[in-house]
């Protein structure tokens, strides 16, 4: 399953991040493979807002389609 399929309120575990530049950027933001995050919002246009601890990160729909997850 990919992150773009997560519904608001779902807690998910990140299985695989896109490689290269995107992966490095997520790691800088404190998000890595194996982390548990909350899908806190789904915005118009497909943007997904995830929350880890008290930090929220908005992820565009194209990038969300490249992030593999599993529901908890």
Enumerate the predicted regions with their spans:
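Compact, glycine-rich, soluble single-domain proteins
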Residues: 1-72
